[in-house]
């Protein structure tokens, strides 16, 4: 079953650091089979905390998603942004429901 990294950014103090992080880790994430599904964009918050940026990556399996996040190369990339960026980040195993019949 596929898995997803869901990152909800609560604070971005330095856009350049975040850009460097993204440029560094994108090829690393892709090496583990990651595909970007959502990267920022216009949003409206109706309930709860506002997150100025949301990023969702899809992985071929939960194991690959965890392996990527725990890899030394990914951790080194995250070091580029973590001092000026706060986020909620989860790895979720599941599937995207793409039709009404699949949601029943």
Enumerate the predicted regions with their spans.
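C-terminal structural segments of small proteins and small subunits
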Residues: 75-90
